[in-house]
Curated annotation (Swiss-Prot):
Subunit structure: Heterododecamer (2C3:3R2) of six catalytic PyrB chains organized as two trimers (C3), and six regulatory PyrI chains organized as three dimers (R2).
Function field: Catalyzes the condensation of carbamoyl phosphate and aspartate to form carbamoyl aspartate and inorganic phosphate, the committed step in the de novo pyrimidine nucleotide biosynthesis pathway.
PANTHER family in the record: ASPARTATE CARBAMOYLTRANSFERASE, ORNITHINE CARBAMOYLTRANSFERASE, MITOCHONDRIAL
GO cellular component: cytosol
UniProt keyword annotations, A-Z: Pyrimidine biosynthesis, Transferase
Protein name: Aspartate carbamoyltransferase catalytic subunit
Gene name of the record: pyrB
Pathway where it operates: Pyrimidine metabolism; UMP biosynthesis via de novo pathway; (S)-dihydroorotate from bicarbonate: step 2/3
EC number: 2.1.3.2
Pfam families with a match to the protein in the record: OTCace, OTCace_N
GO molecular function: amino acid binding; aspartate carbamoyltransferase activity
NCBIfam families in alphabetical order: asp_carb_tr, PRK00856.1
Organism encoding this protein: Helicobacter acinonychis (strain Sheeba)
Chain residues that bind L-aspartate: K87, R173, R224
Length: 308
């Protein structure tokens, strides 16, 4: 096992040239998941990847597993609810024990924002952050970028575009990673949420009114209300939240005018709470493209860390 290796804990770990390389690789895989070169297949064949997910996941863990299999690697998924952490083993000891088995890469999700940044010092294989607390989810930001790259045609065309994040921005690691990445690429950003769901970001535009966000934006990213991270209820019900912040056909008609606004959501989507059901079937919704691109981008990331 190499003594030095690359990790992906946050998007700032990547140079702009590396981001462009990942977009190029992922674009090929998005067009054809089977377009894995013989050289890559030979180098990655039978490599073992361990998934340590201490929080629930559907899209991320599944797409990493599918990405691994399509590249020819093998994934071991541990059920952390039945692991020795439930018996009192510390996170560091769990990680060290898994690492001692010499996997070729570890993919990790944890409720604590600091977890992967503390554990990386013990890792001599690539460590990929698949979501840490409210701080970072780099592969989600990269697949979202791939989706926008496909739609607008180039990074140059993305520069100067306006994106509004609507919903529980404060508790969203997806928003945090996307904001940092998209700012590097020259996009303008607005955050739309009630005060209790807005982070302290004095240099970023904010609004409490979804109509203002829609008028501002070329791209809307809806975010799930993360009630599991709230100490006290913010709205009496999710229906009350939807009345203020759901992306609906009427709101787009009233405020987007003739703009072809792109609609994104990292999932899971709360239908008719985050986005109106009819809008999820609308041509402007790229939600399923995001899911497909999750496999493609994660194939590119694994190839980048394990082969390049």
């Amino acid at each position: 096992m190499p003594k030095q290796c690359r990790h992906l804990l946050q998007t700032s770990d990547l140079s702009m040239d590396e981001i462009k390389l990942l977009l190029k690789k992922a674009s090929v895989y998005a067009n054809d998941f089977n377009a894995v070169s013989l050289e890559v297949k030979e180098k990655i064949h039978n490599k073992i990847i361990v998934a340590l997910f201490f929080e629930n996941s559907t899209r991320t863990v599944s797409s990493f597993e599918i990405a691994s299999l399509r590249l020819g690697a093998k994934m071991v998924k541990l059920n952390m609810q039945t692991s020795s952490t439930s018996k009192g083993e510390t996170l560091i000891d769990t990680f060290k024990n898994i690492h001692a088995m010499q996997p070729d890469a570890i993919i990790m999700r944890h409720a604590f924002s600091s977890a992967p940044f503390k554990l990386v010092e013990f890792s001599q294989c690539p460590l990929i952050n698949a979501g840490s607390g409210t701080s970072a989810h780099p592969t989600q930001a990269l697949l979202d970028l791939l989706t926008l790259y496909q739609h607008f045609g180039s990074l140059e065309n993305l520069k100067g575009k306006k994106i509004a994040f609507i919903g529980d921005v404060k508790n969203s690691r997806v928003a945090n990673s996307n904001i940092k990445l998209l700012q590097r690429l020259g996009l303008e950003i607005m955050l739309c949420a009630p005060s209790s769901m807005l982070p302290s970001t004095p240099l970023i535009k904010t609004t409490h009114h979804i109509g203002e966000a829609i008028e501002f934006a070329d791209i809307l990213m809806s975010l799930r209300t993360q009630t599991e991270r709230h100490n006290t209820p913010i709205f009496a019900s999710l229906k009350d939240y939807a009345n203020a912040y759901c992306i609906t056909q009427k709101r787009l008609y009233d405020h987007a005018k003739n703009k072809e606004v792109v609609i994104l959501h990292p999932g899971p989507v709360h239908r008719d709470i985050d986005i109106e059901s009819t809008m999820l079937e609308d041509r402007r919704s790229k939600v399923l493209e995001q899911v497909k691109n999750g496999v493609a981008m994660r194939m590119a990331v694994l190839e980048f860390l394990l082969v390049d």
